[in-house]
A protein has these predicted regions:
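Signal for well-folded cores of large energy- and translation-related assemblies
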Residues: 8, 17, 45, 49-52, ...
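Conserved AAA+ ATPase core "coupling" helix
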Residues: 9, 13, 91-151, 157-168
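Non-catalytic, well-ordered alpha-helical scaffold segments
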Residues: 53, 100, 117, 160-167, ...
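Conserved ASCE/P-loop NTPase catalytic core
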Residues: 1-106, 112, 117
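C-terminal engagement/docking regions of AAA+ P-loop ATPases
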Residues: 174-259
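Alpha-helix N-cap and coil->helix boundary residues
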Residues: 37, 94, 157, 161, ...
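Short helix-coil transition/hinge motifs at the ends and kinks of transmembrane helices
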Residues: 22-25, 128-132, 176-185
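Short hinge/gating elements
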Residues: 37-41, 84-85, 132, 144-156, ...
């Protein structure tokens, strides 16, 4: 979905349409693009807040309510979103409640020279193959394979010590005064319990990708920036000093010891 300033909530969730049949007129719900396995919300912060909030129920409750009726989302449902820098024209800040519902916030910067050269080569190769048959395209991943992978990740072992380390990291964002300056001057609002859940899920996923059946502090530290950077609200003092969320998380990682 391309998010634009004139987008309406019904363009996302769908709407009831009046149909004339032999038995008379009736309303029928026409599903919107949100009813898909993988939803890409492109430039999400170009749309007004009321459209952004249309995603909230679907992302958290896995359902959409239209005209008093509830419609369930598919079992396999994920939302990816891109956003423009807030200083660009025509952008709206995402509400904290919506940001908190995203599992991770991945920062994508400009590629280095070598990677940009590979991008040019890849694009050139793809353009050269367009007139050819699509027989060589990779097969789609069966949904069951994704469900099986999720089940394996759910079985990754998390020790009490690893869990305590995750909780300590989250509590450091909520009670930075326990760690003194400068941390207590930088954080205005810390991570919610969704931050703890995200850290746990992503650490287990990272352990699974690394071929391990248990979570270590290294797994937790490797995902904590992506899990927490969008959940912290920094103080005016931090912003005025040019301190960003990643620097705050780095400071937390250096102060909170792994058991």
């Amino acid at each position: 979905m391309q998010f634009t300033p004139d987008l309406l909530p019904s363009d996302v969730t769908g709407a009831e349409i009046y149909l004339q049949t032999e038995k008379g007129g009736q309303f029928q719900f026409q599903k919107g693009p949100i009813f898909a396995n993988l939803v890409l919300a492109d430039e999400i912060n170009r749309a007004p807040a009321k459209v952004q909030s249309a995603l909230l129920e679907a992302m958290e409750e896995r359902q959409v309510t239209v005209a008093g009726k509830t419609y369930k989302m598919p079992d396999l449902f994920m939302v990816l979103a891109t956003e423009n820098p807030i200083e660009q024209e025509g952008t709206y800040p995402l509400p904290e409640a919506q940001l908190d519902r995203f599992l991770m916030h991945v920062v994508i910067t400009y590629p280095d020279e070598a990677v940009e050269g590979e991008i040019i080569k890849l694009n050139r190769a793809e353009n050269a193959q367009k007139p050819k048959s699509h027989a060589s395209e990779p097969a789609a991943v069966p949904q069951q394979a994704i469900f099986d992978a999720r089940a394996e990740i759910d079985n990754i072992f998390v020790s009490d010590l690893a869990q305590k380390y995750m909780v300590d990291l989250i509590y450091a964002t909520r009670f930075p005064d326990r760690y003194g300056e400068p941390l207590d001057k930088w954080i205005q609002i810390g991570a919610s319990p969704r931050g703890s859940l995200a850290l746990d899920r992503c650490a287990r996923a990272r352990a699974w990708l690394d071929g391990h059946d248990f979570v270590t502090p290294d797994h937790i530290r490797s995902v904590m920036h992506d899990c927490l950077r969008h959940r912290l609200i920094l103080s005016y003092e931090a912003v005025s000093q040019g301190v960003n969320a990643d620097q705050v998380i780095d400071k937390i990682a250096s102060l909170v010891a792994a058991a």
